[in-house]
Amino acid sequence: MMIEKENKNIAFVDGQNLYMNTAKKDIDPWKIELGRFRIYLEKKYNVDRAYYHLGYTDKKYQDLYEKIQKAGFIIVFKQHSEAMVGLKKGNVDSDIIFSAMKRLYKKEDFGKIILVSGDGDYKMLVDFLIEENKFEKILFPDRKFASSLYQKLGSEYFDYLENNHIKEKIELKKKRAP
């Protein structure tokens, strides 16, 4: 008797959206400990591969890139022409959408997709993935900045990273003074 292997899920993280809506927000900022976040994605959502999309490379952020990779994420940088590097914001939405659709088109062997962003630009992708039974969950970094386009999405398809039951598992713990 052959045991069927459970398909592993894939996560796509919009790195700028995650950072801007947690650590960089004006009210009650908090930092995610990337290693704990990666483990959370694996344990809670059976994520085998987690792609962390960033806007562009800059040597001054090399330490950050190493932290992201050490935590178990696969970094994907947005392609820019040499003249535009450093002048554009991240805007990785189309890259994430294309990557997800390419995997579907090529019939890549995976379970479902988990998306980490509050950006409304992913709404059509989310709707299509639900229709194709290939969508697990969208994790909004911040309730206040989650796009209103997702309001009609059933609660089984989303959660907020700032919710206490998630935040306590992934938040960077502040070191206590000696």
Give the positions of each predicted feature.
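Well-ordered alpha-helical segments embedded in enzymatic catalytic cores
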Residues: 33-37, 95-100, 121
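Internal catalytic-core helix/loop-beta-alpha segment
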Residues: 86-116
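Acidic, PIN/NYN-like endoribonuclease modules and their adjacent C-terminal/linker elements
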Residues: 127-178
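Domain-level signal for Mg2+-assisted phosphodiester chemistry and nucleotide/NA-binding surfaces
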Residues: 1-88, 92, 131, 135, ...
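Acidic, metal-binding active-site segment of PIN/NYN-like and related structure-specific nucleases
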Residues: 106-135, 139-141
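A generic secondary-structure signal
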Residues: 40, 99-103, 128
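Short, surface-exposed amphipathic charged segments that create phosphate/polyanion-binding patches used
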Residues: 66-68, 88-97, 151-153, 170-178
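Short, well-ordered alpha-helical microsegments
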Residues: 61-62, 122-124, 146-147
